[in-house]
Structures are given as structure tokens and as C-alpha cells.
């Protein structure tokens, strides 16, 4: 591997689920050059690329599909805040989650629905009230521990949160 390949691989290893623009900022490479090297790394199976609507995320090859789902959620501020609130205190009601993450009910609803759809959070009925519970607790705990500096302490702006909603 040449120096650029090593640099890109290091960036992706340290920041699983990173998007193209973030890699471009971190590496200092221009769009076309970066695209060429990432395509080459993907073709040789050195990195894993998951393409979704309006976004492409890059992962080390050992990351599983379940892990990539958790990492995708942890890389966005609001879903990360929701998961951390549920880790701190399990079985919260919707209104409690709204207070915890300090976002509007519609924003919390949007991201909570996505977390439920991704099977990271489940809804339980307790005393006829909906309560939210982390479904993949062990996996989330493991990934937070493994990638804490890069995923959890990396600031994301509200604007990026809106743009990268899904």
C-alpha cells in the first residue's frame, strides 16, 4: 500500500461510518483523487462501503451490518443523545426523552422512529404507557467503548444532523 492508501485506511479505521466529505477534510485530498483511492480500496476489499439514500459511509472490513447500524446512529447528535439517555435510564417515556435531549417532540419522534425501525430501540407498554428500551444494549455498549473518542466526542452540528437524517 502506498502512503495515501495507508492514510485513508487509518482515517476510516479511527472513524468507522465516516462520510466522503469528512474523509476529504481529514485527508486534505481533492474530490477526484479521494474518489479514485476509495474506489481502489473498496475494489480490493480493504474497506467496506455502505451506500444509502443521499449518503455513503465507509467502514473497516471487519465491521458487521449490525455494528454499522449502531455506528450510523452514534455518529449523529440526536440519535446518539437518545441512545445515551436510554443507557443512563432505561424505559423512558416519550416526554422524558424530549426533556433529556432538549429537542422538539417532532425531532425526537423522527429519530426515535428510525431507531425503532433499525431495531436499536423497542417500545414496551408499561401501565398503558409507551416506554422506550434499548434492544441492542450489549452491542451499543461495546461500540461506545471501542470507538468512544471518535464517535461520541466528535462534535456534530445540528445542520449536519438535519442533512444526514436518513
Predicted regions and their residues:
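A short acidic, leucine-rich amphipathic alpha-helix
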Residues: 22-26, 96-101
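Short capping segments at the starts of secondary-structure elements
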Residues: 15-19, 77, 89-93
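Short amphipathic alpha-helical interaction segments
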Residues: 29-40, 102-117
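Long, low-complexity, charged/polar intrinsically disordered regions in eukaryotic proteins
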Residues: 20-25, 29-68
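Long, low-complexity, charge-rich intrinsically disordered regions
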Residues: 1-2, 6-14, 80-88, 105, ...
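Short alpha-helical segments that sit at the start of domains
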Residues: 1-7, 54-80
Amino acid at each position: 500500500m502506498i502512503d495515501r492508501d495507508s492514510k485513508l485506511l487509518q482515517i476510516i479505521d479511527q472513524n468507522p461510518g465516516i462520510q466522503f466529505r469528512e474523509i476529504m477534510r481529514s485527508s486534505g485530498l481533492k474530490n477526484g483523487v479521494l474518489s479514485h483511492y476509495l474506489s481502489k480500496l473498496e475494489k480490493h476489499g480493504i474497506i467496506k462501503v455502505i451506500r444509502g439514500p443521499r449518503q455513503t459511509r465507509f467502514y473497516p472490513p471487519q465491521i458487521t451490518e449490525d455494528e454499522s447500524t449502531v455506528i450510523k446512529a452514534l455518529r449523529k447528535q440526536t440519535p446518539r443523545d437518545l441512545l445515551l439517555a436510554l443507557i443512563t435510564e432505561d424505559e423512558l417515556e416519550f416526554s422524558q426523552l424530549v426533556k433529556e435531549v432538549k429537542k422538539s417532540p417532532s425531532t425526537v419522534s423522527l429519530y426515535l422512529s428510525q431507531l425503532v425501525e433499525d431495531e436499536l430501540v423497542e417500545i414496551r407498554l408499561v401501565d398503558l404507557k409507551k416506554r422506550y428500551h434499548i434492544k441492542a444494549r450489549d452491542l451499543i455498549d461495546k461500540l461506545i467503548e471501542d470507538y468512544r473518542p471518535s464517535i461520541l466526542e466528535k462534535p456534530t452540528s445540528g445542520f449536519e444532523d438535519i442533512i444526514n437524517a436518513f
